[in-house]
From Swiss-Prot:
Keywords: Cytoplasm, DNA-binding, NAD, Repressor, Transcription, Transcription regulation. The keyword Iron-sulfur does not apply. The keyword Transmembrane does not apply. GO terms for molecular function: DNA binding; DNA-binding transcription factor activity. It comes from the Bacteria. Gene3D superfamilies: NAD(P)-binding Rossmann-like Domain, Winged helix-like DNA-binding domain superfamily/Winged helix DNA-binding domain. Homodimer. This is Redox-sensing transcriptional repressor Rex. HAMAP family: Rex (MF_01131). GO terms for cellular component: cytoplasm. It is found in: Cytoplasm.
Amino acid sequence: MTDHKPSKSLPKATAKRLPQYYRLFKSLVEENVTRTNSQLISEKIGVDAATIRRDFSLFGELGRRGYGYETKVLRDFFGELLGQDQETHIALIGVGNLGRALLHYQFQDRNKMRITQAYDISGNPLVGTQTDDGIPIYNISDLEKNVKKSDIKTAILSVRKENAQEVVDTLVKAGIKVSLNFAPIRLKVPSDVVVQSIDLTKELQTLLFFMNDNKQ
């Protein structure tokens, strides 16, 4: 297989499908399936076969015509792309209802990501304590200083939208280049910083649209 890495110009839609591909090939290997093809992959993940072949072509020769794809090879390939061979430490900013749920989410049971620090404002009674798993919850004023001293490379923002820009600015100063944002606001960041935003209200409204549309 040709050794290819994705370029920074990899389409965003393709990048979003990478975890799906990794999970599928990991599952197939665990089921002792040694080989598959784009049609079978399509049936498993609900993406059309042509799109899958186009995605894979961006990385070089991941398979062979008439032979298909070796599941273990592609599991390892996509796992490496997604950094599954290294542990990723995450800072969580905002320990409200959503933040507390994220603190208890077992990222590490599924991959090598784990929250190692959490932050909130001084008015939150959890500040100065730690979770049952030993994750310290710091005052937000210590964010830049602590992150700079740590090996944290990514962050999750679970804060009010009016505070989100200030928080991401602080993260950028601390050297964080990748963040997941749950605040319903578009954040302004430098061109070398990536922010993936998830607006839960917007996602639910979209689902409601499809639900109502199906009734007609």
